[in-house]
């Protein structure tokens, strides 16, 4: 009886860990997908776009009129809806 309870609890714990790991991977997938879509090589950039879609961080800022998105880490248009 003790062994079966131990195996049941161990199995439930393992199931929890596997589900948590797969869920965290699913949360990262959209960020990686969008980053790869908007990652542009410097040869293909159009001058009209300026900095839109460029990778950035807080040390390496964006062009004027653009801000670094906290979530996606690329330059986006600045606007009143941005925090």
UniProtKB/Swiss-Prot annotation:
Signal peptide annotation: 1-21
Alphabetical list of SUPFAM superfamilies matching this protein: omega toxin-like (SSF57059)
UniProt keyword terms in alphabetical order: Cleavage on pair of basic residues, Disulfide bond, Knottin, Lectin, Secreted, Signal, Toxin
Any further remark recorded for this protein: Exists in two forms, due to cis-trans isomerization at Gly-79-Pro-80. The trans isomer is the most abundant (75%).
Stated family: Belongs to the neurotoxin 10 (Hwtx-1) family. 51 (Hntx-8) subfamily. Hntx-8 sub-subfamily.
Domain characteristics, as noted in the entry: The presence of a 'disulfide through disulfide knot' structurally defines this protein as a knottin.
Protein known as: U5-theraphotoxin-Hs1a 1
Species per Swiss-Prot/TrEMBL record: Cyriopagopus schmidti
């Amino acid at each position: 009886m003790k062994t079966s309870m131990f195996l049941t609890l161990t199995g439930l714990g393992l199931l929890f860990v596997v589900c948590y790991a797969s869920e965290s991977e699913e949360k990262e997938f959209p960020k990686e997908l969008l980053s790869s879509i908007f990652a542009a090589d410097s040869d293909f950039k159009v001058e009209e776009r300026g900095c839109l879609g460029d990778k950035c961080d807080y040390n390496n800022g964006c062009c004027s009129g653009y801000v670094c998105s906290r979530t996606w880490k690329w330059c986006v248009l600045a606007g009143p809806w941005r925090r």
